[in-house]
């Protein structure tokens, strides 16, 4: 947090991840709930210069919207706020920590994290679990993803979390780019035209 204070200015825009909300990383169990997140939210909100739940900034006529999806789901208040952003009528790039999974992104993630011999065993989509299962079973999140797939103003999604770099068509109007961590020297320049 000291580095955020020192190096990130007021113009920063971002979507925090599970590492920011985890107070002790692997030294205590993470509950993946809003209550668990709330334990760290006040401290984080004082350091990061943007609304942690949902923040929007227009840059060169494009509405960059960051959305807290740290545990794979979204909440009703975030859906309402996103819809209000869409009513502005500007092209939208949605930035999240956890991607909104497609079958292809889920498959790529599971193959990456599989034991080496299992990686090339099958082209089948692995059974949903974790964040992917939450996105399929949580009604608010599932409905929001269905809405996003039909939102013509959505032009791109930028995400991380998986520690792999992959991209896939999310909807007729939007590509989703998932980029691995900087600690792996991953990065991707995305140009929107």
Model-based region annotation:
Residues 17-18, 97, 160-161:
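Active-site glycine-centered loops adjacent to acidic/histidine catalytic or metal-binding residues
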Residues 1-91, 115-121, 150-153, 167-192:
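Extended active-site neighborhood of metal-dependent phosphoesterases/phosphodiesterases
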């Amino acid at each position: 947090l000291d580095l955020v204070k020192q190096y990130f200015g007021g113009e920063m825009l971002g979507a925090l991840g599970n590492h920011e909300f985890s107070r002790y990383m692997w030294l205590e169990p993470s509950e993946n709930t809003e209550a668990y997140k709330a334990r760290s939210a006040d401290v984080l909100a004082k350091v990061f210069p943007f609304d942690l739940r949902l923040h929007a900034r227009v840059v060169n006529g494009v509405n960059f919207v960051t959305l807290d999806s740290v545990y794979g789901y979204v909440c009703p208040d975030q859906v309402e706020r996103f819809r209000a952003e869409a009513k502005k009528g500007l092209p939208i790039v949605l930035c999240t920590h956890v991607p909104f999974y497609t079958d292809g992104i889920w498959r790529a993630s599971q193959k990456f994290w599989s034991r080496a011999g299992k990686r090339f065993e099958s082209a089948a989509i692995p059974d949903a679990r974790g964040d992917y299962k939450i996105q399929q079973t949580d009604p608010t999140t599932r409905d929001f993803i269905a809405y996003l797939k039909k939102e013509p103003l959505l032009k791109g999604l930028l995400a991380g979390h998986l520690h792999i770099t992959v991209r896939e068509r999310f909807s007729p109007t939007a590509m989703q780019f998932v980029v691995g961590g900087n600690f792996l020297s991953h990065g991707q320049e995305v140009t929107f035209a």
